[in-house]
């Protein structure tokens, strides 16, 4: 893998990118071969020899930590909710990891997004965690604050930043203009900031573009109850609104106004330039706080299976930039994605298996909108810049 060529194509000058370049000297001749492990093999592998794995990172290795935290609110011992009606919220702002929630650019912003998914606090010296792909840096599995797992923000965001300047700003400008978003439709939520109940249901829908249906033609969303967002047929069970959501949390809860919902799978639309890439999340936890009629201070945390994430990048990158029309350059990019694996697809991190997923943490803000009632037409992707 020619990391130097990849960095040259991206123009990435970050410390992370330079660190990955150093790793190419540690024996990565074909990371794509090892990325066959992306598909999720749980076959045992030999534990790593010890903390001094990569000399390039050991000199600045994080000090070992035993502090645990960064967890979502636990399920309360509380009665089932008796609140009636549905409440629907659209994500209006998404924080990807290169800025704080206040919009301040920071190389460490990613550390405050996500949750401690594997129950461990990991740094470059940790050995009780899943095995890195050969060639990945020792700190590829380093956690954020309080053990928050977010390799996406730590290791992939520099690549995205090289493809799209100010990706969070681009994402949120797109949402304001009506680019695809995510809806959460909640049953059992009273909107009381002190509510504590179990037995809530949360349906999640990926939408099409706001203006893709006739009633919204020429309009931008207002992020009020006047907005009717069309949802993708794939976001429903059987291709109709009446069939219900394909992604449902049936045992959600709320603690002191903080909503917690878990999903087995949840694709999250993310804007890359003019192309929308669906983040193929699994083992997902979504939290948000009830405030002023909206769900605020939201967090989406989960894992991206490495093979699925490579496929998502493959489908999107040629529609974003001509930098990877060269098949070798594209392969370098996909290998770099694979090398970011820091966790298991099931959300655990066991020393006897190889990492086969990429942890992710995002922040969001939402606003109340109309209940789901309309399907979006099939989306039309932007042109492939490498064939047009």
Task: State where each predicted segment sits.
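Bacterial N-terminal signal peptides
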Residues: 8-21
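Bacterial Sec-dependent N-terminal signal peptides
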Residues: 1-9
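Extracytosolic secretory-pathway proteins
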Residues: 61-388
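Residue-level detector of functional hotspots within protein domains
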Residues: 8, 35-37, 57, 245, ...
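Ser/Thr-rich, Pro/Gly/Ala-heavy low-complexity intrinsically disordered linkers and tails
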Residues: 1, 18-79
């Amino acid at each position: 893998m020619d990391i130097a060529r990849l960095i040259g194509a991206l123009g990435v000058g970050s410390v992370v990118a330079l660190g990955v370049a150093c790793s190419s000297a540690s024996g990565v001749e074909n990371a794509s071969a090892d990325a066959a492990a992306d598909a999720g093999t749980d076959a045992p592998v030999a534990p790593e020899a010890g903390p001094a794995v990569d000399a390039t990172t050991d000199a600045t290795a994080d000090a070992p930590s035993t502090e645990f935290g960064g967890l979502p609110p636990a399920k309360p011992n509380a009665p089932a909710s008796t609140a009636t009606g549905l409440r629907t919220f659209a994500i209006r702002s998404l924080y990807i990891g290169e800025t704080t929630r206040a919009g301040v650019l920071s190389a460490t912003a990613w550390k405050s997004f996500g949750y401690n998914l594997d129950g461990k606090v990991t740094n470059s010296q940790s050995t009780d965690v899943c095995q890195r792909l050969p060639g990945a840096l020792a700190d590829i599995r380093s956690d954020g604050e309080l053990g928050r797992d977010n390799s996406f923000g730590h290791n992939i965001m520099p690549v995205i930043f090289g493809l799209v300047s100010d990706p969070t700003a681009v994402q949120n400008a797109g949402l304001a203009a009506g680019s695809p978003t995510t809806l959460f439709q909640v049953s059992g939520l009273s909107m009381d900031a002190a509510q504590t109940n179990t037995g809530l249901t949360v349906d999640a829908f990926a939408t099409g573009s706001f203006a893709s249906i006739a009633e919204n033609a020429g309009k931008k969303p207002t992020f009020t109850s006047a907005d009717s967002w069309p949802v993708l047929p794939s976001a429903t069970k059987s291709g109709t609104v009446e069939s219900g959501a394909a992604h449902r949390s049936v045992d959600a809860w709320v603690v002191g106004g903080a909503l917690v919902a878990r999903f087995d799978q949840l694709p999250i639309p993310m804007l890359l330039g003019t192309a929308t890439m669906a983040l193929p999340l699994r083992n997902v936890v979504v939290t948000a706080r009830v405030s002023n009629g909206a769900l605020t201070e939201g967090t989406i945390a989960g894992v991206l299976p490495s093979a699925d994430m490579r496929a998502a990048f493959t489908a999107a990158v040629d529609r974003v930039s001509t930098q990877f029309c060269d098949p070798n350059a594209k392969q370098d990019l996909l290998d770099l994605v694979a090398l970011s694996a820091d966790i298991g697809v099931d959300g655990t991190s066991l020393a006897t298996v190889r990492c086969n997923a990429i942890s992710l943490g995002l922040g969001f803000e939402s606003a109340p909108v109309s209940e789901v009632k309309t399907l979006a037409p099939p989306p039309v992707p932007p042109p492939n810049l490498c064939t047009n």
